[in-house]
């Protein structure tokens, strides 16, 4: 069950959702819960790059680390801030692993156990560093590698 708090879309622990992508991150399949939270119609999501839901406040460095691991064949778990098609934000705890010819990402509600608050704080600091680098002309991808 989803609710709205400020600009954030909240959902319940029972809302487990997934998507599959090809090796380049293009969405091949998604369940209805994902489509509902992402606020994009299936026709728009299937065939789109997964970064269609990427939030600008999500540190590029986190995605760099995630891609490094999954491309090396290691599963990865991370807290991820997404932006829905209606402009609202939603946080997930994503578990991503390789499957034949692509990846599967299973997402759940982040636990409110103190870790999530710490992650949000760290992400904010990292994103501030990335923005400062961007102001100095460093491309986002390059800043993420530092």
Task: Annotate each predicted stretch with a short phrase.
Residues 128-146:
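Signal-transducing coiled-coil/dimerization helices and immediately adjacent hinge/linker segments
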Residues 1-2, 144:
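Short, low-complexity, intrinsically disordered N-terminal peptides in bacterial proteins
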Residues 2, 6-125:
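Sensory/regulatory domains in signal-transduction proteins
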């Amino acid at each position: 069950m989803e609710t709205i708090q400020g600009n954030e879309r909240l959902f319940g622990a029972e809302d487990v959702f997934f998507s599959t992508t090809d090796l380049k991150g293009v969405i091949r399949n998604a369940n209805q819960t994902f489509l509902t939270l992402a606020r994009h119609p299936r026709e728009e999501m299937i065939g789109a790059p997964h970064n269609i839901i990427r939030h600008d406040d999500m540190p590029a460095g986190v995605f760099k680390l995630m891609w490094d691991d999954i491309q090396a064949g290691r599963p990865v778990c991370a807290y991820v801030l997404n932006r829905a098609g209606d402009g609202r934000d939603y946080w997930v705890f994503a578990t991503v692993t390789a499957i034949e010819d692509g990846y599967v990402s299973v997402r759940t509600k982040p636990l409110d156990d103190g870790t999530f608050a710490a992650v949000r704080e760290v992400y904010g600091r990292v994103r501030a560093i990335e923005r400062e680098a961007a102001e100095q002309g460093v491309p986002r991808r390059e800043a993420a590698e530092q």
